Amino acid sequence: MEWRNLPRRARPSKLLLLSLERIGVVDPPEFLYREYDSKATLRCDLMIFVPRSTRYPDVDPWFISTTGFCFPDTYRKAARKALRRLRAIYRHHL
């Protein structure tokens, strides 16, 4: 079970990328995932690492992690979770 980068067929969520760009995150987020079998069920762990914003340098880099059943579902779940976290972290700045 090794961690891998986002596969080429999967593009980062446009809404997430545009939201990050709006708050000054110029480097793209890093996506890492792994798929494995757990009790005969396919599982997927995914992490999104978001770098520091140039517009709000007082906010530290952050990440989210989530677990799902297959990559496409886990990827959508992680993107939604990252958007919620983004809103929570930057609500005092926006």
Question: Where in the sequence are the language-model features?
Answer:
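Short Trp-Ser/Thr-centered turn/loop motifs at beta-strand boundaries
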Residues: D60-S65
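N-terminal segment of the canonical double-stranded RNA-binding domain
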Residues: M1-D58, F69-P72, R76, R80-L94
